[in-house]
Amino acid sequence: MMKVFLKKVNPDQLLSIRSKVLRNNSDFKFCRYDGDNANSSIHIGAFNSKEIIGGVSLIKNDSTHIVLKNCYQLRGMCVNDEYQKKGIGKKIINYAEICCKELQISNLWMNARIKALKFYLKLNYIDSEIKYDIKGIGLHHFLYKKI
């Protein structure tokens, strides 16, 4: 079993993994999110012994489709292709939820890509059945979870 460790990082540390996994190696300027640099934002990186292999950002944002009180948006969840299906994504999400609980955040929500839908449903996220296309990226579902 590969050793993976998780830690809070600054948003710039996630740009390379976001670019590679989520944006087809796009320029980093296309890999930044509104709220990345807010003091309330939380960024988590997953590392093997030498490099970042995954990550996620938690950004204080009102829910876009359903009224959720005291919520954060889960953004930029990614794991390098060669490390997928090894439980790393689940570890990242579990750690993200713990970070939210420590801050007494009640709900997490996200715009989930179709190919990631089963992953989130296994982690007890609720599919609102609201679907929409994000230009240049594809069809997404609005998911949420009370934590």
Which residue stretches match the model-derived regions?
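Conserved acetyl-CoA-binding loop of GNAT-fold acetyltransferases
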Residues: 121-130
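C-terminal "cap" of GNAT-fold acetyltransferases
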Residues: 113-114, 133-147
